[in-house]
Amino acid sequence: MIKSFYIHNFKSIKNLTVDLAYNAEKAPNGYKKSDSHIFFQTGSKKSDRVVPVFAVYGANCSGKSTVLLAMSVLNKFAKGWGPVVLFKPNKLSNLSKEDDRTTFALEFYCNKKLYAITLTYNAKSILHEELKVDGEVLYCVDHSKITCLNESLSKFADDFSEILKENCVIAMNSHQVNMFLPIIRKFYPGISKDLVAVHNYLQNDIIILSEDQSLDEPLSYIECFNLLSKTYKGERANTAKKQALSDLVLTMNGLDFDISNLSITNSGIKTTHKSSEGKEVEFDFKNESEGARSLIQKLMLIMYALRVGKTIMIDDLDKSLHPLVACELVRMFKSKRLNPNNSQLICNLYNTEPLSEVLSSSETGVLSYSKKEGSVLTRVSQIKDLKSSDDLRYRYARGDFGGIPFPYI
């Protein structure tokens, strides 16, 4: 589960932190008996509480998609991509040459430990890479040299330095072009449970569905469906797929989408509707509404995340969807019944209905943009004059929190 994500000098962002820590002074009365997740308790301390949902509001071009893209870039580094194609600095800010670098710092909980991975890079090289576990440094690479290893890894210092030199650093200019983490995982796959946990988390435990396709093609419907069907363990492949389809249709019906059956194969998607006479009529998927097509893809990934406890980040969650449907998608992550594995949702929204229906101030951020400050994220719970009785939807629409456009023609 993500606790925070810090971004420096990336596209429209100069400095921004997405903070998912539950920051109310105390938990509400009766929260343990509530049907809804108020927070996830990831450790014994109050500081180990994180929210199940974080929704970001903001005007067009304020940088909402940039946050998801930044996470995609960190994911790409973990998969072996280099800095040349991943360096996307803020071109509108007056940053000094020394500050012409991007930094990502991700804090997340895994196996009841708090991990913090920090990566700084420019167009030519990875400048700094560091991994901490519960506040202690596991390893640190700075300007192409290993500067710190914890006690259990220090015995491999010479081997690690040689691996770094041979597999991550260009000899002629000493530029580090590959992240150290996946290389160590490759050469020493079982050397540290913490290294394995972090690498697996960065590669597999964060699902990103973004409108920005500059780095990746979006997941196809069949890829989304295969992810979902594989969560039905202990079943034969065909039986698992049938059960996944059945649950998908049932959930869509619960969201008031009138589809009686679905067929998802490599050759395409077919939907079935019942006629006025009760007969089943098959349709090609392209004939469905944009809302239905959008929902099916999102819903497959949401159901997958809920079944296995992943974190999912969705750009424009409410795109082409009725506000009440968008509310229910958010509510799925707050439901203890539907989300028993502590899955997290981070999403961008335009529709304000969830502010009245399902989102708390701790679960809401507002993004504003200016050329001087770049994209600035304000967490609603940190606004000084906010009262617990305030209507968040009304106050946001009125402009009290910023993050709204001021159109005039």
Regions found by a protein language model. Give the residues of each.
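Switch/communication elements of ASCE P-loop NTPase nucleotide-binding domains
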Residues: 1-78, 271-404
